Amino acid sequence: MLSESSCIPGFETMITVRPGSHVHRLITVLGLAGEYPVRSLGVLGNERTLRALVSKLSTTQELRNPDTDERMRVKLLQMTGIGNAKAIRFCKGALPILEWIHPDAYGYYMAAFYNHRFPGGMAHRDRNLRVAETIGMHLTAGIETRAYLLPALQNRAILRITPDAPAFYLARDFKKITPAEQNKTMFTRIVGAIFYPGGCYAVYNTRNAAMKWNGMGEFKALHSLTELARMNAGVQSIDSAILLGESYDTALTTLLESDKIRRLELRFDGIYRHIYFVPMNAGGIRQFRLLTVPDWKEKLLELLFDPDVRSYNRGFMEYDASIGGTCVFSHLDGDIARLIRFREAMQTGAGSFEVLCFDDQAPFLREYLGPYITLKTIDAATVEAELGL
């Protein structure tokens, strides 16, 4: 909804900035990201509704704070850039509205974005938009990403700092801990990290292009993140990353490009044992929620297979169960690093193979694995219901 206020045809509608509404989410994201790409509005909710809302907020409107009944008549948004780089920003005169979101939101914005200035060239801008999309995905999935609500990470002692619930920390906030972090993350593609009970994921966003990895830079970033996880979350090692992309076409392109790289240390599966590809759509939002359930891997395998057929990581290849002589592999988690190992074993070994997947993963898997593999689709809603998502 554009507003929680009553709407009478022919009359101007006042927009109420109510928690949970599209306008509240949009203001929250801009307060964290500075700008947001128009092409990715669908990540934040109904794309058609949000486009109409952005158009409306790009003209002078009256907005209302439901908690205090304070009113503000202002042009909230402006557009910048063209094509894929077209983005939404606040108008400077509207910045006080951040106080409606949280008392610390305005101060965070002004410190993070140089008092509402956006220096830098196209590469800097592209990184900003990657970060913005990533924030939008986490916020929509219910993963806390509001930096002003998260306890600050530190490197002085081994403490339990991170929240019990899943939380996303931006890479730019890693750099505030010590100046040395600046050099470790400056030239890598990492945009942040999710801390959840029992683990941590490095998070990347490749948007609509094949992921290109800075091999040694990513190793250094991983080492730095592992130290932060050890000092703040009780996590001793990190072997997993989440890779966001526009669609499964992006995942396929990334895998095919990776096949051309012969030096393992420059391939993403040489850096992280597990890479979970998450498309930036409603299916990806569901996948985010799955990946942050405590002990989700075991719960998922228990749901899919009886104990007597499971592999329990035994055997000559990556598979999850053996049923009637067929090796069954689950790709419900979107782990493309594990998928590479499965395909390599499948191509060099004889036997019957079956892959479990969600409906939206099937075309990508058919293209990557070839026509002779059996694909069995699983209803996403059923999995969510069984896991309590």
Regions found by a protein language model. Give the residues of each.
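Nuclease-adjacent, charged terminal/linker segments that flank catalytic cores
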Residues: 1-128, 151
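Short boundary motifs at domain starts and secondary-structure transition points
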Residues: 15-16, 192-195, 316-321
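Generic detector of well-ordered alpha-helical segments enriched in charged/polar residues
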Residues: 27, 51-54, 135, 253, ...
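Hydrophobic, Leu/Ile/Phe/Ala-enriched alpha-helical segments that form helix-helix packing faces
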Residues: 45, 53-61, 134-145, 224-233, ...
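Short secondary-structure junctions
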Residues: 60-65, 144-148, 299-309
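General detector of folded, globular domains
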Residues: 87-110, 122-140, 191-193, 327-331, ...
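Mid-protein regulatory/catalytic core that forms ligand/cofactor-binding pockets
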Residues: 123-255
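Long, compositionally biased intrinsically disordered regions
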Residues: 203-210, 231-234, 238-389
